[in-house]
Amino acid sequence: MSDIKVRFAPSPTGFMHIGNTRTALFNWLLAKKLGGKFMLRIDDTDKLRSKKEYEDAMRESLKWLGFEWGEEARQSARFERYDELRDKLIAEGRIYACYDSPEELEIKRKRAMAKGQAPIYDRQALKYTADDLAKFKAEGRKPHYRFKLVDEVIEWDDIVRGHCKYEASKLSDPIIIREDGSYLYHFPSCVDDSDFGITHIVRGEDHVTNTAAQIQMFKAIGGKVPTFAHLPLLTGTEGKLSKRLGSLGVRELKAEGVEPMAICSFLAKLGTSDAIEPYYTLDELAESLDFEKLGRSQPKFDEEELKRFNTKFVRSMPYELVANRIPVSKEFWEKVKPNLDVVEDIRVWNNICNDVVVPVMEDRELTEIAASVLPPEPWDDTTFNAWLNEVKAKSGKKGKELFHPIRKALTALENGPELKTLLPLIGYEKTLMRLKGIKA
């Protein structure tokens, strides 16, 4: 086991979606490839929006995807630690109170924009007089708190983006504590990453500017700065950030029959120079992980493409991966899987071919003709069409009048798998009996 340690830190304010699934996946694969540890951290500082049902659903989704973890923490249990370091940094002048109202901040932002300037906080709060503070108190204002950035060039080597450089003077001091005393993302995340020994942080590129500020936070609290990897964000098929990507849930995909390893294979290779091909274990997928193959452009995620890939995935799945899920033999699975879209479809085939079917007799005259000309086995790919043509010639029926009564007799279903493929799997004896209206 190496010293490498990563974390997946979801906020339980909604269900697992494609975006954070991809983040969890890359973290897990990195830990697995480097022989490190994967930690789950519940970022539940938002007391109003955090819900246990979301947290439980996230755990369920992570386990279904195959991600394992040996350590976990939750931020709501660590407020004393955050407060301890907050007080230390206030005393050192690195965290300071601000009484600007949202309206006042918006006015400042618009003024800066009108002048063609970046809307950087002007640090007016550092110039408060005793009279100012007395006035704010009399008005009942409560402060929010900012982290004071040191004027320097902040640099790091990003696994995905390469060398990154930001001038702290061109960044606003980030707000880290709200007026109600609750913490925003930045500060608790740094404290946790430092305390739990996180060595690598893999997350979306929307956090890049956060990283610049957080590097200074790590140093301010005496922590070691981790290695960062910022993944390009997924877009919809139209090339824009899509609300659908934030709502398309793992639970929804699971309900639609999308396989967990199909999701992982697809997301791991989307936007890379590798072809999107089926991987049947996370270990195998982890071995193929190479951040250098990850492009800088934002990959387009297409839900329908994922489902098509899932069909390809299912049709090449080894029997060993489904043996404990479906009540069929290996021989039957291998014969039928080229016709499946999702694994659960096998149950329809199994019911028709291996279970007892009560025929629905829609046209006895037709099915009696069909029974009378049913050829003996062995059957090959030409048998069905030759047999059907003979039934057609003898009955004078065609189209739906020909197909439908035979389907209902053989399967008792209105619709279903192709009869041409089904017939050899049902076999001569059962086919003959069902055509005669006998339960078989």
Where are these predicted regions, by residue range?
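Catalytic adenosine-cofactor/nucleotide-binding cores of aminoacyl-tRNA synthetases and other
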Residues: 209, 221-359, 411-440
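Short, histidine-centered active-site or binding-site loop motifs used for metal coordination
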Residues: 8-12, 42-44, 191, 195, ...
